[in-house]
UniProtKB/Swiss-Prot annotation:
InterPro entries, A to Z: Gas_vesic_GvpG_halobact (IPR054797), GvpG (IPR007804)
Protein name: Gas vesicle protein G2
UniProt-annotated location(s): Gas vesicle
Chief subcellular location: other
Additional record remark: Encoded in a 14-gene locus called c-vac which produces cylindrical gas vesicles only in the stationary growth phase.
Function as written in the Swiss-Prot or TrEMBL entry: Proteins GvpF to GvpM might be involved in nucleating gas vesicle formation. A minor component of the gas vesicle. Gas vesicles are hollow, gas filled proteinaceous nanostructures found in several microbial planktonic microorganisms. They allow positioning of halobacteria at the optimal depth for growth in the poorly aerated, shallow brine pools of their habitat. Expression of 2 c-vac DNA fragments containing 2 divergently transcribed regions (gvpE-gvpF-gvpG-gvpH-gvpI-gvpJ-gvpK-gvpL-gvpM and gvpA-gvpC-gvpN-gvpO) allows H.volcanii to produce gas vesicles.
Family the entry assigns: Belongs to the gas vesicle GvpG family.
Keyword terms, alphabetized: Gas vesicle, Plasmid
Signal peptide (residue range): none
Organism: Halobacterium salinarum (strain ATCC 700922 / JCM 11081 / NRC-1)
């Protein structure tokens, strides 16, 4: 019975774990969020974004970045993350 578990169940569970880690890594990509913060700043500086919208978006993105960094720190304990 244990041999069958080793042959059929364990590879499936490993694959699910790898897919979950990859999905979380993409979902919480800090470089993408940082790029959005830079884009928001640039649009504000060239006058394409009003100050109130800039501040609102900046706060949203900074909150997303904090969350993403926390999640990535937790993931780092599980598996090495390549940047």
């Amino acid at each position: 019975m244990f041999v069958l578990d080793d042959l059929f169940v364990n590879p499936f569970l490993s694959l699910v774990d790898i897919l979950q880690t990859m999905a979380l890594d993409e979902l919480y990509d800090t470089s993408e969020i940082r790029d959005q913060i830079k884009e928001n700043q640039l649009l504000y500086e060239i006058g394409d974004r009003p100050a109130d919208e800039y501040e609102r978006r900046k706060q949203e993105l900074e909150a997303q970045l904090r969350t993403a960094e926390q999640i990535r720190d937790q993931m780092r304990d599980r598996m090495e993350i390549k940047n």
